[in-house]
């Protein structure tokens, strides 16, 4: 039986610009490019936008949802000590939430999850925890010896008609990212890259999220236990609506009854011991 070798991640040939834009200020040119990108994303054949069910976030995403045939990146936020391990679970959980929203629209399909023996995160996904968002029986785990094998498996998976592809990597690989983005666009299958280290500002990904765990609000009768909270930043939104904030950020809380994430109101961001500031009317 022949052995299939991983694809060489060679950069695609770049096409030169036919002409330089004339008479546009940098801000005007940037906004014009963004409009073209949004129009291009909305016109992609066979692709849909999946709402996250969080109005504040959906309002910034293209057509009010997450683009299916695209590459999305999720970073673990830095812990106070400088280590990211403390927030691995938050990044994994947010990824599982995104997958759950996508799978709500699909009754069938497998999720291909690729990682290395010494993965970017401390431990592989935990099936009972994933069951909060989707049936873990739909998960197919692939362990790759080398990072290039991991990217090869992801690209092959995007061509295989499955529901979604996830890969864990320690650092950004621009060439691999371009190939994955093109494969996702062609197949209409979403690809997710979970990264331990922050990536470059410029990227082909449709969205980039940074997720960190946050202190939960204690539930009466359960001591210090409370619903999970994550601090989520949308650090790149290639086809979406520009935000008034340079990097929009939300404190999200999981609701076990509604099975939804919701933005925590600003009044509930404070700790129990923090003093209230009272302003005269």
Predicted regions and their residues:
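Detector for small/aliphatic-rich hydrophobic stretches
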Residues: 1-113, 123, 129-137, 240, ...
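Conserved beta-strand segments of the P-loop GTPase G domain that flank and frequently precede/overlap
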Residues: 75, 113-115, 140-143, 165-169, ...
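Generic hydrophobic/aromatic pocket-lining and core-packing "Φ" positions
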Residues: 99, 154, 180-181
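Conserved nucleotide-cofactor-binding alpha/beta core module
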Residues: 108-163, 175, 185-187
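Conserved nucleotide-binding/hydrolysis micro-motifs of P-loop NTPases
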Residues: 117-120, 172-173, 198-200, 238-239
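Switch/connector loops and helix/strand junctions flanking conserved nucleotide-binding motifs
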Residues: 121-124, 201-204, 242
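A contiguous pocket-lining binding segment that forms or flanks enzyme active sites
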Residues: 162-218
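C-terminal functional extensions of proteins
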Residues: 211-281
